[in-house]
Amino acid sequence: VSLDSVDLYGYHILDVPNDEGGRDCLRWQRVNGIPRERRYVRVAGVAPDIDVVPFVDCIDTLLRGVLERVFLVKDGPGFSRPPRPMAGVFSRRLAAVWNELAPLLPSTAPVSHGQFVQDCRGCKRKRYQRALDEKRAGRFNLEEDARLTVFVKFEKTDRTTKSDPVPRIISPRGYRYNLSVGRYLKPLEKKIFRSIDRMFGHKTVLKGLNAVNSATVLREKWEHFRDPVAIGLDASRFDQHVSREALLWEHGVYKACFRETKHKERLGVLLDAQLLNHCVGETPDGRVEYSVSGTRMSGDMNTSLGNCLLMCAMVRAYARARGVEVRLANNGDDCVVFMERQEERVFSSGLREWFLEMGFNMAIEPTVDEFEQVEFCQTKPVWTPDGWIMCRNISTAVVKDSIML
């Protein structure tokens, strides 16, 4: 990958073809400025010697995050573009899933702008109230308000376990856009999760459950099988691999939940703004601009819901194609699949290739046949006198809990 070409304004350029026959373009420029060190406080003497620090706010950090989490994937010693799905693969492979899910979807209407604001808490309510006031004053432009501001996530980054971690990028849209689309999508979230649960016939999306309830659900899945095993599915950088075709399938589910044609059409217009993303990021010493077709933007209102929906639908379709009975535990792109030991080989065979044809790099984690070794959302089940509970890795927990950002 070469970033040596420079335009008339001094911007370095990366210009690559996308899956729509167009071009995804990245431009960046270094300016005079001092990178900002992000401050944190550590309680000394209580944690193992694990190096956990946040990234510096600088153009090099932001540029690397954009390159490796949006534009490129690791390919041996170098990089290549993320895999893209075969044409029409979502409508073909997920047709049976859609036929199962559609009758279970809610039939609803959007909440008012005011109700959406009232449902927010703290600083968010103030910001969305300001956005509502601006929208009522006529200050809403879909093209401008759907643009994204990107920055490096301020988080505790483990640099011991991962010797060269890639910074994570947050990419929110404007508050007026989020207000407009949020009144449709936010009330849908739990309803669609329940629809997914009914489609599978058991609790599937574990989002929002506490450590005790999560462990209870996982144990029920484990005990459903006579000779159980569990397989973790690791979708490498899931957001980066969400293609335009995947987004269109996901958006179709949302629109099907609204009774009135005018609501379907208005939501469709708002969601179409997520199909081609225009992003800008600034640091004290530089600026990044890029446009990209498809790709999940981490700050979108439907990031959590959409990732759960896509992952559950694909695992459902894959298990049906293999003829394997499974019990799925899902929390976005984090998945564990339970099944009979005798069906493990059938399930695993061809999985990576099947998901690659859907546009996703899916790795199979080592199979476990002890319940205590099941890992879900960086926790494992532990037996206590009061029952099962999900617990974090003790070393990592002590290190991260002794640091305040």
Give the ranges of each region predicted by the language model.
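Viral RNA-dependent RNA polymerase
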Residues: 1-405
